Amino acid sequence: MLKEDAVFVHARLVELSREFGRACWTILGEGNISGRIDQDVFAVKSSGSSLATLTEIELTHCYFDRLLPVMDRENVSEAEIEGILRDSRVRDTALKPSVETFFHAYLLTLSGVNYVGHTHPMPVNQILCSGVGTSFAEERRFPDEVVCCGPVSLLIPYEDPGLALARRIRQDVKNFESKHGKPPKVILLGNHGVITIGGSVDAVRVAMSMTVKAAEIFVGAHALGGNVPMPQREVDRIENRLDEEYRRRMLRI
Protein backbone atom coordinates (compact mmCIF):
# COMPACT_ATOMS: atom_id res chain seq x y z
CA MET A 1 0.00 0.00 0.00
CA LEU A 2 1.32 3.45 -0.92
CA LYS A 3 2.05 5.99 1.79
CA GLU A 4 -0.25 9.02 1.93
CA ASP A 5 2.50 11.26 0.52
CA ALA A 6 2.99 8.94 -2.44
CA VAL A 7 -0.75 8.85 -3.17
CA PHE A 8 -0.82 12.67 -3.25
CA VAL A 9 2.25 12.91 -5.49
CA HIS A 10 0.86 10.28 -7.87
CA ALA A 11 -2.46 12.09 -8.19
CA ARG A 12 -0.79 15.41 -8.95
CA LEU A 13 1.62 13.85 -11.46
CA VAL A 14 -1.15 12.07 -13.36
CA GLU A 15 -3.15 15.31 -13.45
CA LEU A 16 -0.15 17.29 -14.71
CA SER A 17 0.82 14.64 -17.23
CA ARG A 18 -2.60 14.48 -18.84
CA GLU A 19 -2.81 18.27 -18.95
CA PHE A 20 0.51 18.41 -20.82
CA GLY A 21 -0.71 15.69 -23.17
CA ARG A 22 -4.05 17.40 -23.88
CA ALA A 23 -2.18 20.57 -24.75
CA CYS A 24 -0.29 18.59 -27.44
CA TRP A 25 3.06 19.56 -25.96
CA THR A 26 4.10 15.94 -26.45
CA ILE A 27 2.95 13.12 -28.70
CA LEU A 28 3.45 9.36 -28.50
CA GLY A 29 5.99 8.60 -25.74
CA GLU A 30 7.63 12.04 -25.67
CA GLY A 31 8.34 13.96 -22.48
CA ASN A 32 8.33 12.95 -18.84
CA ILE A 33 7.44 14.12 -15.34
CA SER A 34 8.61 13.36 -11.82
CA GLY A 35 7.88 14.16 -8.20
CA ARG A 36 9.70 13.65 -4.92
CA ILE A 37 8.13 11.08 -2.58
CA ASP A 38 10.61 11.52 0.29
CA GLN A 39 14.33 12.07 0.80
CA ASP A 40 15.17 8.66 -0.65
CA VAL A 41 12.62 8.02 -3.38
CA PHE A 42 10.96 9.80 -6.30
CA ALA A 43 8.33 8.85 -8.88
CA VAL A 44 9.05 9.24 -12.59
CA LYS A 45 7.24 8.41 -15.84
CA SER A 46 8.11 4.99 -17.18
CA SER A 47 9.81 4.56 -20.54
CA GLY A 48 7.49 4.57 -23.54
CA SER A 49 4.36 5.64 -21.68
CA SER A 50 2.31 8.58 -22.97
CA LEU A 51 1.81 11.75 -20.96
CA ALA A 52 -1.66 12.15 -22.46
CA THR A 53 -2.90 8.82 -21.09
CA LEU A 54 -0.58 8.24 -18.12
CA THR A 55 -1.87 6.05 -15.30
CA GLU A 56 -0.47 5.48 -11.83
CA ILE A 57 0.95 2.10 -12.81
CA GLU A 58 3.12 3.92 -15.37
CA LEU A 59 4.82 5.91 -12.60
CA THR A 60 7.95 4.14 -11.35
CA HIS A 61 9.49 4.74 -7.93
CA CYS A 62 13.29 5.06 -8.01
CA TYR A 63 16.01 5.46 -5.40
CA PHE A 64 18.06 8.64 -5.66
CA ASP A 65 21.21 6.95 -4.36
CA ARG A 66 21.24 4.37 -7.16
CA LEU A 67 21.25 7.05 -9.85
CA LEU A 68 23.10 10.14 -8.64
CA PRO A 69 26.54 8.46 -8.13
CA VAL A 70 26.44 7.21 -11.73
CA MET A 71 26.67 10.80 -12.95
CA ASP A 72 30.28 10.88 -11.74
CA ARG A 73 31.29 7.62 -13.43
CA GLU A 74 33.12 7.58 -16.74
CA ASN A 75 32.65 5.29 -19.71
CA VAL A 76 29.25 3.91 -18.75
CA SER A 77 27.93 1.73 -21.58
CA GLU A 78 24.35 1.72 -22.84
CA ALA A 79 23.93 -1.81 -21.52
CA GLU A 80 25.12 -0.67 -18.08
CA ILE A 81 22.70 2.27 -18.14
CA GLU A 82 19.83 -0.12 -18.88
CA GLY A 83 20.83 -2.19 -15.87
CA ILE A 84 21.26 0.86 -13.63
CA LEU A 85 17.80 2.17 -14.52
CA ARG A 86 16.23 -1.20 -13.74
CA ASP A 87 18.20 -1.55 -10.50
CA SER A 88 17.10 1.93 -9.39
CA ARG A 89 13.49 0.76 -9.07
CA VAL A 90 12.03 0.37 -5.60
CA ARG A 91 9.95 -2.58 -6.87
CA ASP A 92 11.56 -4.91 -9.38
CA THR A 93 8.16 -5.53 -11.00
CA ALA A 94 7.73 -1.84 -11.84
CA LEU A 95 8.08 -0.60 -15.40
CA LYS A 96 11.50 0.58 -16.53
CA PRO A 97 11.97 4.31 -15.85
CA SER A 98 12.63 6.79 -18.64
CA VAL A 99 16.21 7.11 -19.90
CA GLU A 100 15.98 10.76 -18.79
CA THR A 101 15.46 9.68 -15.17
CA PHE A 102 19.02 10.76 -14.38
CA PHE A 103 18.28 14.47 -14.85
CA HIS A 104 15.04 14.14 -12.88
CA ALA A 105 17.00 12.61 -9.99
CA TYR A 106 19.45 15.51 -10.03
CA LEU A 107 16.91 18.32 -10.39
CA LEU A 108 14.80 16.95 -7.53
CA THR A 109 17.80 17.37 -5.21
CA LEU A 110 17.82 21.15 -5.74
CA SER A 111 16.59 23.25 -2.85
CA GLY A 112 12.83 23.82 -3.01
CA VAL A 113 12.28 21.54 -6.02
CA ASN A 114 9.67 18.80 -5.60
CA TYR A 115 8.38 18.40 -9.16
CA VAL A 116 9.88 18.36 -12.67
CA GLY A 117 8.14 18.51 -16.06
CA HIS A 118 9.67 17.96 -19.49
CA THR A 119 7.84 18.45 -22.80
CA HIS A 120 8.52 19.09 -26.50
CA PRO A 121 6.10 21.91 -27.47
CA MET A 122 6.19 22.79 -31.15
CA PRO A 123 6.37 26.60 -30.64
CA VAL A 124 9.34 26.22 -28.28
CA ASN A 125 11.15 23.74 -30.51
CA GLN A 126 10.68 26.02 -33.51
CA ILE A 127 12.95 28.40 -31.61
CA LEU A 128 15.30 25.77 -30.15
CA CYS A 129 15.90 24.35 -33.63
CA SER A 130 16.78 27.82 -34.97
CA GLY A 131 19.58 30.31 -34.45
CA VAL A 132 17.67 32.59 -32.06
CA GLY A 133 17.44 30.35 -28.98
CA THR A 134 19.83 32.49 -26.94
CA SER A 135 17.66 35.57 -27.46
CA PHE A 136 14.56 33.65 -26.35
CA ALA A 137 16.31 32.37 -23.22
CA GLU A 138 18.00 35.56 -22.10
CA GLU A 139 15.32 38.16 -22.89
CA ARG A 140 11.78 38.68 -21.68
CA ARG A 141 8.94 40.01 -23.79
CA PHE A 142 6.13 40.74 -21.31
CA PRO A 143 5.70 41.02 -17.51
CA ASP A 144 3.95 37.71 -16.83
CA GLU A 145 6.81 35.87 -18.49
CA VAL A 146 9.07 37.33 -15.79
CA VAL A 147 6.60 36.47 -13.02
CA CYS A 148 6.12 32.86 -14.07
CA CYS A 149 9.43 31.93 -15.70
CA GLY A 150 11.91 34.16 -13.89
CA PRO A 151 14.04 36.94 -15.42
CA VAL A 152 16.13 34.55 -17.51
CA SER A 153 16.03 30.92 -18.61
CA LEU A 154 18.91 28.47 -18.91
CA LEU A 155 19.71 27.38 -22.47
CA ILE A 156 21.69 24.16 -22.91
CA PRO A 157 23.03 23.13 -26.33
CA TYR A 158 21.99 19.72 -27.62
CA GLU A 159 23.28 16.73 -25.66
CA ASP A 160 22.51 13.06 -26.10
CA PRO A 161 19.38 12.32 -24.02
CA GLY A 162 20.17 10.25 -20.96
CA LEU A 163 23.30 10.32 -18.83
CA ALA A 164 25.22 12.81 -20.99
CA LEU A 165 22.35 15.29 -20.88
CA ALA A 166 21.95 14.87 -17.12
CA ARG A 167 25.63 15.66 -16.59
CA ARG A 168 25.41 18.77 -18.76
CA ILE A 169 22.27 19.93 -16.95
CA ARG A 170 24.01 19.51 -13.58
CA GLN A 171 27.05 21.48 -14.75
CA ASP A 172 25.07 24.32 -16.29
CA VAL A 173 22.55 24.59 -13.44
CA LYS A 174 25.44 24.95 -10.98
CA ASN A 175 26.92 27.71 -13.14
CA PHE A 176 23.51 29.40 -13.35
CA GLU A 177 23.12 29.26 -9.57
CA SER A 178 26.58 30.78 -9.09
CA LYS A 179 25.67 33.67 -11.39
CA HIS A 180 22.04 34.29 -10.39
CA GLY A 181 21.90 33.01 -6.81
CA LYS A 182 19.15 30.45 -7.48
CA PRO A 183 18.32 27.72 -9.98
CA PRO A 184 16.41 28.47 -13.19
CA LYS A 185 12.67 27.91 -13.34
CA VAL A 186 12.95 27.04 -17.03
CA ILE A 187 15.65 24.98 -18.75
CA LEU A 188 15.64 25.08 -22.55
CA LEU A 189 17.29 22.16 -24.35
CA GLY A 190 18.63 22.93 -27.81
CA ASN A 191 17.02 20.81 -30.59
CA HIS A 192 15.05 18.97 -27.91
CA GLY A 193 12.52 20.63 -25.59
CA VAL A 194 11.90 22.37 -22.29
CA ILE A 195 12.11 21.48 -18.60
CA THR A 196 10.33 23.36 -15.82
CA ILE A 197 10.96 22.79 -12.12
CA GLY A 198 9.35 23.97 -8.90
CA GLY A 199 8.17 23.28 -5.40
CA SER A 200 4.65 22.47 -6.55
CA VAL A 201 2.88 21.01 -9.56
CA ASP A 202 1.38 24.47 -10.07
CA ALA A 203 4.85 26.00 -10.42
CA VAL A 204 5.82 23.45 -13.06
CA ARG A 205 2.51 23.88 -14.91
CA VAL A 206 2.57 27.68 -14.87
CA ALA A 207 6.19 27.94 -16.02
CA MET A 208 5.57 25.45 -18.84
CA SER A 209 2.38 27.17 -19.98
CA MET A 210 3.99 30.60 -19.95
CA THR A 211 7.07 29.34 -21.80
CA VAL A 212 4.84 28.03 -24.59
CA LYS A 213 2.91 31.33 -24.70
CA ALA A 214 6.18 33.28 -24.80
CA ALA A 215 7.43 31.08 -27.64
CA GLU A 216 4.30 31.72 -29.69
CA ILE A 217 4.68 35.47 -29.14
CA PHE A 218 8.40 35.32 -29.97
CA VAL A 219 7.81 33.44 -33.23
CA GLY A 220 4.99 35.81 -34.16
CA ALA A 221 7.07 38.88 -33.36
CA HIS A 222 9.85 37.66 -35.64
CA ALA A 223 7.31 37.05 -38.40
CA LEU A 224 6.15 40.67 -38.04
CA GLY A 225 9.61 42.16 -38.32
CA GLY A 226 11.54 41.27 -35.18
CA ASN A 227 11.43 40.59 -31.45
CA VAL A 228 11.33 43.65 -29.15
CA PRO A 229 12.30 42.56 -25.62
CA MET A 230 11.52 44.39 -22.39
CA PRO A 231 14.32 46.67 -21.13
CA GLN A 232 16.42 44.85 -18.53
CA ARG A 233 15.63 47.46 -15.87
CA GLU A 234 11.93 46.70 -16.31
CA VAL A 235 12.56 42.95 -16.11
CA ASP A 236 14.43 43.50 -12.83
CA ARG A 237 11.62 45.74 -11.58
CA ILE A 238 8.92 43.12 -12.27
CA GLU A 239 11.02 40.35 -10.72
CA ASN A 240 11.28 42.26 -7.44
CA ARG A 241 7.89 44.00 -7.16
CA LEU A 242 6.00 43.20 -3.96
CA ASP A 243 2.66 42.89 -5.73
CA GLU A 244 4.11 40.35 -8.13
CA GLU A 245 5.48 38.35 -5.20
CA TYR A 246 1.95 38.31 -3.78
CA ARG A 247 0.64 37.01 -7.12
CA ARG A 248 3.23 34.23 -7.06
CA ARG A 249 2.03 33.16 -3.64
CA MET A 250 -1.59 33.18 -4.80
CA LEU A 251 -0.61 31.10 -7.85
CA ARG A 252 1.41 28.76 -5.58
CA ILE A 253 4.50 29.26 -7.69
Map each language-model feature to its residues.
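Glycine-rich flexible loops
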Residues: 1-253
